[in-house]
Amino acid sequence: MADGVAGPDARMERGLTYPSGPPPEPGQAVAVAPGVLWMRLPLPLSLNHINVYALADGDGWTLVDTGLKTGVSKAGWDAALAGPLGGKPIKRVICTHMHPDHIGLAGWLCERFQAPLLMSRLEYVTARMLIADEGQPAPDAGAVFYRAAGWSDEQIARWRTGYGGFGKAVAAMPAAYQRLSENDVLRIGDDDWRVVIGEGHCPEHVCLWREGDGVFLSGDQILPRISSNVSVWPTEPEGDPLGEWLRSLVALKARLPSDLFVLPSHGEPFHGVATRLEALIRGHETALKRLERTLRAPSRAVDVFPALFARPVGDEVLSMATGEAIAHLNYLAREGRARRDRDEAGVDWWTLTEAAK
């Protein structure tokens, strides 16, 4: 249904309503709200897709997110531009954040249509920094970080070999951008969209809220079925992204009307934002309780995976799982509930503090 009202294909799942029916195939689009087209591009990952959106903008379109830099994604855009987008020009490209599945083709699209790129400052600058790592040697600080987490020499060697891979998934970024900040209002076509900033999954994530009819482009800040990765990385080993994430979720729950129609980057558009935000918050609180039980015995970051993840952690997701484990450990440390001691081999062993026992 065009306005997010439940139609014959609508279904309910865990307190959320999905009104929009089956997702579009690559190159196709579904009108999910007035002036909003939902499209989908494949990802060569276990999370096998990203949703991208086109917003009617006068005689053209504003795009929100772009997919990875792959031939399949480019073909999907070519088909969409010639098909549901009607051959109209792209006037602006907005990226919710700097992860490659979101910015991968931003530069390609901006150059093709001479369109400006709109992002928050921290996301743009972080993307440029990570792209610049391509071809550079892996820093020793990263090896120290992962050894402290409990990685083996072999795992650290593989990390060194793959270092700088971010740039391979991202087309060259525009050398200039337009900054988006909290509470900015963008005029897109006949509509005003308010910028809402989230934190935790990334430094300065942009969401877009059309307050007139309650349409909310959530990016990765609110997903219907999975919780976005929240990780500490070697560049900021003492960071507290989980604290930022939880504070953002609490603030969004207090701010957003319960009847919003949420258009996420993964999964399907849904109603039930308050229910979903509460579930995300509760999920991390439950994980922290399991983690505290694990820390009754000294543990490395890699030892706490079973407390946080339902499935075994393979090498393909080891860095993300490690980052998320350290995010939870750092959070407990800031709360005075956990401490760490580094042994002579450079490995951190985490335990509960006396106050938390």
What are these regions, as identified by a protein language model?
Residues 49, 126-131, 226-228:
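Short, charged, surface-exposed secondary-structure boundary motifs
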Residues 26-88, 208-224:
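Conserved beta-strand hairpin/beta-sheet module of binuclear metal-dependent hydrolase folds
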Residues 61-71, 165-178, 185-187, 192-285:
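Metallo-beta-lactamase
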Residues 72-74, 78-187, 214:
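Active-site HxH/HxHxD metal-binding segment of metal-dependent hydrolases
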Residues 7-32, 36:
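N-terminal amphipathic/basic leader segments beginning at the initiator methionine
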Residues 35, 55, 65, 97, ...:
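Divalent metal-coordination and catalytic microenvironments
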Residues 77, 245, 249, 325:
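Aromatic/hydrophobic pocket-lining residues that form the small-molecule binding cavity
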